[in-house]
Amino acid sequence: MKVLIAESDDFSQEVISILSKRFDLKVSNNLSQKKFEEAFLEYDIIWFRLRYNLLNIDNNKNIRCKFLVCPVTGINHISKVFLEKNEIYLISLKGEKSFLKEITPTAEHTIFLTLALMRNAIRSIDDVKKGNWNRDIFRGNELKNKRVGIIGYGRLGKMTANIFSAFNCDLTVFDPNFHIEDEISYRKAKRIEDIFKFNEVISIHVDLNSTTNKLIDARILKYCKNAFLINTSRGEVLNEVDVIKAIEDENLKGFAADVINNEAIDYKESELFKYNLTSESNIILTPHIGGNTYESFEKTEKYVLDKLLNLINK
């Protein structure tokens, strides 16, 4: 079987060694989107992360690929129709709850973004690089004892809430999948509006689906009162135009995100990306680096390799 690793930067050498002994392996790190799509005609197994998208790939070609390995939790950059039509088995981390309890970097990044936002860290660093030393203009806020709202109480929501609790934050959580009998460690909100009405820091951790697409819009944001909003889930859960208006109207005191709308196809078309280029507002955008650590790459690549080999050996 022919295997292509299409994103080889910082790839587990142990996994490469195992693959090279069992398969005809090619390792690449500079394929264009077009060449990546053409690889489905040549390889049996293709391995990639988030660099490419499979949303507009031609379904009418003679596809050879039978296994697609993508060691990430969010797979909205991959067409389900394409996979089903060509009988390609997707191996990802989506739904791997037990394993993912050990993968913490996105929760850590959420806390970093929160602190950086509240303390004006990025703007103060940039100002020092310009040769200034203006302490007073970057006075910030403490995280300790703040009212924090968590939207989405799955793996990452729980993990992030537990870290916030170390700062003695007053936590309220909302999840549309809550049941009355669910036992949780923190106060439970019945409506998402209550999260925005009563909290000073709001962190989003929902999956992207038909229910959560544009979940946060003007209808919800109008309840904010000078809050800090952080999104490390998916860019599409926000209406970016409405977020920008909330920033300009000072309903939001600051906004930070590791994800933007439509980033898998053309990040430059994101309204938040364009706004951030010239805005002087308190905004932080990072290029989807939440799970992007050496440690997590090593762990996740070994895990999906085991899944792949188990399937092939059946």
Tell me the role of every PLM-derived stretch.
Residues D44-I125:
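Phosphate/diphosphate ligand-binding glycine-rich loop within oxidoreductases
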Residues E96, D170, N226-A227, S233-K314:
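Rossmann-like dinucleotide-binding domain for NAD(H)/NADP(H)
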Residues R51, T73, E200, H205-L208, ...:
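Short glycine-/small-residue-rich Rossmann-like dinucleotide-binding loops
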Residues M1, D136-N226:
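Rossmann-like dinucleotide/phosphate-binding beta-alpha-beta segment
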